[in-house]
């Protein structure tokens, strides 16, 4: 038992299965209790009840699974993950499991490399294969009875793994090295500094001609232009004047003023019912005799209608 590294006062879990003999289990537990002492504790449980037990996280210092002589326990990924969960940070797991030594693709029995990969995926580190040994006649018979599997290429492998010194999801502060700013200024090449430096004395050199921006404009350029002169030659030609799209010459504003002036000269209804028809119009309504129209629709009256009104 010295290879398991069990110390006095530690909490140890021993997992077995139905293939483990009671005498061998009692003998193993007695030896472990002798190592843990009165301050420690040894917990024994069937591996098939591990997931249902719902142990608290970080409960055990050492876990022994399948170590009972004659045991042929097979560890599922879920069982390995739960063992890693209930191990304390820095705790160790020791297990023994039958493995295939050939490259036969088998869903029941893993190879030694797949067993180590499963331990790594469960969250353990420092996975090591301690030893391999042939199955005893009792173990071979147990494989045949409980698992219905028989093969001449089976071996029993002992593997160990360690839980990292931190819990999953824990956080710690990183000590970042901040680079101190140097008080010594970098050396600058004088030739390079002179190349990229423009002196004020160079600006006052008589050989440099500066352009006066005021001399670029003539007196005619400073006069405000007449809006009529900005119109295009073909803008508004024809019987019906029409402003161009995005007009900038002022024709659009001019047409808008003329339209608003024409609308203001039209007579306005005092009752507001003129558009409904003659049945709703007054006796002196200028729209008498005209059909009904939509509210807001522009209706032009002839001079005779205006005179009658």
Swiss-Prot record:
A motif (Cx2C motif 1) lies at residues 271-274. Residues 235-249 are annotated as: Fe-S binding site A. Signal peptide: none annotated. Residues 6-172 are annotated as: N-terminal SAM-like domain. Its cofactor is [2Fe-2S] cluster; [4Fe-4S] cluster. Monomer. Interacts with NDOR1. Interacts with CHCHD4. Belongs to the anamorsin family. This is Anamorsin. It comes from Rattus norvegicus (Rat). The lineage of its organism: Eukaryota, Metazoa, Chordata, Craniata, Vertebrata.
